[in-house]
C-alpha cells in the first residue's frame, strides 16, 4: 500500500511542474 502512495506522489511531482511549464508556454505563445 505504501508503494501505491509513493507512486501517486511521484506522478504528482512530475505532473505539477509539467503543467505549470505547459501553462506558461501557452501564455507566452498566445501573447506573441
UniProtKB/Swiss-Prot annotation:
It holds the Pfam family PetM. It is found in: Cellular thylakoid membrane. The chain crosses the membrane at residues 9-27. One of its GO terms (biological process) is photosynthesis. It is a single-pass membrane protein. The keyword Flavoprotein does not apply. One of its GO terms (cellular component) is cytochrome b6f complex. It comes from the Bacteria. Its main location: membrane. GO terms for molecular function: electron transfer activity. Keywords: Electron transport, Membrane, Photosynthesis, Thylakoid, Transmembrane, Transmembrane helix, Transport. The keyword Cytoplasm does not apply. The 4 large subunits of the cytochrome b6-f complex are cytochrome b6, subunit IV (17 kDa polypeptide, PetD), cytochrome f and the Rieske protein, while the 4 small subunits are PetG, PetL, PetM and PetN. The complex functions as a dimer. Belongs to the PetM family. Component of the cytochrome b6-f complex, which mediates electron transfer between photosystem II (PSII) and photosystem I (PSI), cyclic electron flow around PSI, and state transitions. This is Cytochrome b6-f complex subunit 7. The gene is petM.
